[in-house]
From Swiss-Prot:
<feature type="domain" description="Peptidase M12A">
    <location>
        <begin position="71"/>
        <end position="266"/>
    </location>
</feature>
<keyword id="KW-0865">Zymogen</keyword>
<keyword id="KW-0378">Hydrolase</keyword>
<keyword id="KW-0732">Signal</keyword>
<feature type="binding site">
    <location>
        <position position="172"/>
    </location>
    <ligand>
        <name>Zn(2+)</name>
    </ligand>
</feature>
<keyword id="KW-0645">Protease</keyword>
<feature type="signal peptide">
    <location>
        <begin position="1"/>
        <end position="17"/>
    </location>
</feature>
<keyword id="KW-0964">Secreted</keyword>
<dbReference type="InterPro" id="IPR034035">
    <property type="entry name" value="Astacin-like_dom"/>
</dbReference>
<dbReference type="Pfam" id="PF01400">
    <property type="entry name" value="Astacin"/>
</dbReference>
<feature type="disulfide bond">
    <location>
        <begin position="135"/>
        <end position="154"/>
    </location>
</feature>
<protein>
    <recommendedName>
        <fullName>Zinc metalloproteinase nas-1</fullName>
        <ecNumber>3.4.24.-</ecNumber>
    </recommendedName>
</protein>
<keyword id="KW-0862">Zinc</keyword>
<keyword id="KW-0482">Metalloprotease</keyword>
<dbReference type="InterPro" id="IPR024079">
    <property type="entry name" value="MetalloPept_cat_dom_sf"/>
</dbReference>
<dbReference type="InterPro" id="IPR006026">
    <property type="entry name" value="Peptidase_Metallo"/>
</dbReference>
<dbReference type="GO" id="GO:0008270">
    <property type="term" value="F:zinc ion binding"/>
</dbReference>
Amino acid sequence: MLPIVVSILLATPLALCQAPFWMPNMQQFSFLTETDFRNALLLPTTNTRRVRSLYHDMRIPFQRFKRGGGVAVAAEKDKWPNGRVPYILSAAYTSAQRAVLARAFDTYAKRTCIRFVPKSPADKDYIVIQKLDGCYADFSRVGGRQQVSLADECIDYATIIHELMHVIGFIHEHQREDRDSYVSILYQNVIQGANTDFDKLSNLGLSYYGEHYDYSSIMHYEANEGSRNGKNTIEAKNSHFTAIMGKASDFSTSDLRRVNRAYKCSIFAF
């Protein structure tokens, strides 16, 4: 079933429409349409694994480190109220790409209480999804306009739901404070300048809602993510899990429990 917000969209196609007067910079932006959500239902459910490297894909404002608090997700004040995330979407995406985006939005709506909804004139905090320079997103609700970059190489279902997890406040699994009990980081193999993407985020005061470290999380890097020489940058303490890390094509059960607990999604069992 389509998210409730879809039914209130304009009946005319929006992919190439001029932005309403309240959209920033009068650029070409749009929203997903009912057609996009119908097309999403026609997409194959196989071969959805991400194909693009994701190191350096999360941006955390400096003040967030000083404030602390959070949930492996952000502090309460940095969450999106009632799980509602207003968005505007670049009109540069093709109909096929919009269908993949719609599938990601619809999955959040069906399996959590997170709703990505068209930005209204009253919404001051919102995300802008554009084709910029790779795949990345601002961490949690930062206030005002915030960026989600999904370039052409990022338009696969797994990458999109991963980046949207950053938007609602979730960090990478290998950056948990307790990660040293589960994985080893091989900094000697990490691309120069990317060490911070492998550091623990121990000063954010994160909580994990009772969920153990999850090698199958959609938020986990692959073993050779961000490698400068093709060798592993992350290895599981139990070598069996090294081949599993970063191979997720969808949310893990633990991912969904964390989202639903963090946002108090009472209609979902968690």
